[in-house]
Amino acid sequence: MLNENEKENYYATMKILVSACLLGENCKYSGGNNYNQAVCDFARGHQVVPVCPEVLGGLPTPRCPAEIVQGVVTNKEGINVDREFRAGAAKALAIAKENGVGLAILQSRSPSCGVKEIYDGTFSGTKIPGQGVFAKMLMDEGIRVLDAGELPKIILKNEDGKCQSD
């Protein structure tokens, strides 16, 4: 078990995997990004490992939007892209493990990176509880995963001293 000084040093130098789109990289399906200032502020001072599992899986940017349909990643045109998503997730997981990542901050609702909810597979914008392919792989490996949308709440709670994130 780490003592208080060791904990402080560990968290000060923690390696954090971050969805590349959250850092401003134009790798989102639309060709844009999901730049998130709270994520950048939180990551400052840590070693950041940016990844986009979808790009690592060989998908182009921009690309047709995809959702998980009955457990299979399928794009809006009905094309099965599950192999690309799973290959990219496996490559991103290998990067996380090679770098000794202790925490991952991922883009909300993505079929790769959704942490607590994803789109329901109807391409209607309806969300359901669930995890993206990459988020689930990280969780299965015991790597702590946070949804980028929850980060501001976690930071505020910690600054108030009322509670810490799970």
Annotate each predicted stretch with a short phrase.
Residues 24, 57-59, 111-114, 153:
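Short, active-site-adjacent cap segments at secondary-structure transitions
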Residues 12-16:
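Extreme N-terminal starter segment of soluble prokaryotic enzymes
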Residues 6-9, 35-48, 88-103:
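Short amphipathic alpha-helices and their capping/turn segments at secondary-structure boundaries
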Residues 107-122:
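Internal, conserved structured core segments that host functional sites
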Residues 24-31:
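Short N-terminal binding/cap micro-motifs at the start of the first secondary-structure element
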Residues 6, 11, 26, 56, ...:
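Divalent-metal-activated hydrolytic enzyme cores
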Residues 21, 107-110, 150:
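Short, well-ordered beta-to-alpha junction loops that form the rim of enzyme active sites
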Residues 34-75:
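Short, surface-exposed acidic-centric catalytic microdomains
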